[in-house]
């Protein structure tokens, strides 16, 4: 069995996240894609939408796709969870032959700062989703995603044109109410 893990804040989920999910299902030889909304990104101190709201958005977008599992694992920990901990958790459950860990190209600059990175890189095959013309080393597998958007831009500019229709109304309502406070 081969699994892929795609963790993120999904604050909010947008078309690039959706493209990554669909590209992973199409291009990776996997039996399961585990999407993990974080409780809190280990490199951040706060979130815009609470974890349960982000989980609901992820479920609305992807839970009905074949081979996809939306995991509550990190949210249930009520703390920032390093990727290594999530990888070990799912290795214990599924005993996979291969674990792909999907990251955005913007994470490459911080990758060696990740908790126990040297251990993590022995356990997973990194798959990097292209972003903003960031060069991806040739030794890493690449997912070609040509959607230029970030969750930060959506939140800060209330620019919802790249939010998938399945969650658009709820995302707009949430962030407009949050910014009105």
Curated annotation (Swiss-Prot):
EC number from the UniProt entry: 2.7.7.18
Record keywords: ATP-binding, NAD, Nucleotide-binding, Nucleotidyltransferase, Pyridine nucleotide biosynthesis, Transferase
Stored SUPFAM superfamilies: Nucleotidylyl transferase
GO molecular function, one term: nicotinate-nucleotide adenylyltransferase activity
Alphabetized Gene3D superfamilies for the sequence: HUPs
Gene Ontology biological process terms in this record: NAD biosynthetic process
CDD domains, alphabetized: NMNAT
Annotated InterPro entries: Cyt_trans-like (IPR004821), NadD/NMNAT (IPR005248), Rossmann-like_a/b/a_fold (IPR014729)
Pathway(s) of this molecule: Cofactor biosynthesis; NAD(+) biosynthesis; deamido-NAD(+) from nicotinate D-ribonucleotide: step 1/1
Signal sequence coordinates: none
Top-level enzyme category: transferase
Lineage: superkingdom: Bacteria
Swiss-Prot/TrEMBL catalytic activity: nicotinate beta-D-ribonucleotide + ATP + H(+) = deamido-NAD(+) + diphosphate
Homology family: Belongs to the NadD family.
HAMAP family, sorted: NaMN_adenylyltr (MF_00244)
Function of the molecule: Catalyzes the reversible adenylation of nicotinate mononucleotide (NaMN) to nicotinic acid adenine dinucleotide (NaAD).
Protein name: Probable nicotinate-nucleotide adenylyltransferase
